[in-house]
Amino acid sequence: MHPAAREAFCSLVPRPILFLAVTSFGISAFMTQLALMRELLAAFSGNELIFGIVLGNWMLLTGIGSALGKTASRLKSPITLFVLLEILIALLPVADVFLLRTLRNVVFIRGSEAGVTETVASCFALMAPYCLATGYLLTLACMAAAEKLPSPDQPTMLRMVPVGARIGARGEGALTLTLSQRERGQKSIGQVYFFDNLGGVLGGILFTFVLIRFFSHFGILYFPAVLNLALAALVAVSARRRLPAIASALLAAGLIAAAAIYNLDDITCNLQYGGQKVVYHGASPYGMLVVTEDAGQYNFIENGLPLFSTHNIEQVEETVHYAMAQRPDAKNVLLISGGASGTAREILKYPQANVDYVELDPLVLDVARRLLPEQLNDHRIHVINADGRQYVKQTGRRYDVVIVDAPDPSTSQINRLYTREFFDQVHRVLAPDGVLSFSLGGYEGYISKELARLIAVAERTLAQVYKNVLILPGTRNFFLASDGRLTPAVADRIEQAGIPTRLVNRSYLNAMLTPDRMADVRRVLSDQAPINEDFNPILYFYHLRYWISQFTLRFGFFEAGLVVILLIYLARLRPVPLAIFSGGFAASALEVVLLLGFQILHGCVYHQVGLIITMFMLGLGIGSLAMNRFLPRCGRNHLAALALAITIYSLCVPYILMFLGKSESPTIAWISWPAIPVMTLLLAVLVGMEFPLAGKVGFQDVAATAARLYTADYIGAALGALLVSTLLIPILGVTAVCLLAAGLNLLSAAVMIVSGK
């Protein structure tokens, strides 16, 4: 850092204010990431590929920003840039959400889905300013913290460990460091890492457990915006920068006034769904729910994906009668999802039927009761707010018919309703000869190669549990499974039972269930098709390919450029950054594995999922704090030992998850609740310990070292986020992903040991 600039930071900005500013970065980054993630998923009809693209772009861009931060050592006025960047990261999230909602239907055709290439480019462009600024600030903060670490004869309450003697003189243009300067630089990297993660913990707790329940995304983002503007003003005042201080204060006041006067959530939502009347929009813990009304039809949309529409008589009647016609005398019917669309009431046409309707999102139920009271207000409909799979696992009731009216398996969470393990759980709650029904993919007279794979996998997975499987090609492919008899003569059964229908009648069924269409479906079945399992979700991957097949996938200069840059970067990684890269990849990959394991074991319980993410951030903070205290006694071999510890951990994870999943013991089931959060904490502690130690082992100067390590960490995490959930787990399975993480960390440990000899 320029000598005059160093003096300004040392003498003018107190360390508590500097670390408060870094903590505010962490709060802002975590809240912004979660809010933007949900907005982007909604804007681009998010499946897990979109999730991976968004998170991968976020990590990659922040890593690039950190790499650019090494130029901070040449700045003449770093405080001014520090304040300006903090103002920027305060305002950009609100602007990003506004632009995303208003420009989505300007850049792309309204109502159309954006392809993969368009999504990658859009996410990259939208997130680039914020992520680059955040990454740069982290490196700049490391430099500021290094200059402000006290000498032993300058005691302070904030000193974490003793450091060396006073900073020695530096010759003009020289790169020589005294021992004291080196120790200060090494310490600063770990301290900034700790306070950044502390902010992430606070942001995660606030977002997950408080703000999301009471505020829109705009309302949530106002909190970190005002916080960052306040800290920017405080830093500017401390540094006697009057103009930036006044600007920060005025912007904070203006933002508060604008929030009070204008409801940006209402304004942008109406622009986003122009042509339809938005009758409700809001955020629940499970996503963004929008309800529009068009010509008397209500459309429920969650995270950009249509949940259901009212007056869709064809879909409602097919969903109900293909299944119920198999057992017209059914008394107990379980309906998982979709009941508010009219399916629950349609089931009541069968005189003996009583319906248990299970819906995960309480907001969907609340809005449906408000807008569609006639659909659920009946003493024969029992509404249960729970995760469908968890309910099936825990219920002691027996059902004659189980109808899963869920979307296609576009995410690993939804895929849980299409696995062999779930089908086996349903089998246990079915009465003898009971029927399970669900639909998968559309049928318009032609079965594509991608759709054929979906059908074959679903049929073979069902056949592992049920004696009989029947597929009826309606507007969608309806799967029926039972140990009893199944018949395609749906029209005969409906007429014999005297059930009135509006569309699904004999003429309709004769047109749909023709011998040719039935033969087309049978033709794609295969005894060699893979089986969809909890920890090997191949059906989700095939659905992803089915979704991608709807677009013209172009691998253009943008994607090629990213790949080339990444390959060059990986080829040039030295041992210490390689350890951080491997740890970042393992952290991202194994966190996805643990979240998947928790959802499989205990269902999608939002607060618990939020707890796991918060525990991960907490573990990073604990690990970095612990290593900062023992840093003087640790060296290169300890970094290799941490990489080996992550290797061993990675090898243990799949076997622990499978043991917890297969055990029928109530004690093991009880232990599994805290087990996964504790496993997450342990993983994060190991990864968090690596970063400060790498800052010491690979130290050159503060800017270069911080930039290099943050870049390696974020790029490793970006690859883990992008590849693991979208490709590696669906194709290879959980065990292979854990082996890959173990192998990468074993390689980094070996390189570290060999290079140190």
Go through each PLM region and give its residues.
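Alpha-helical transmembrane segments of multi-pass membrane proteins
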Residues: 1-757
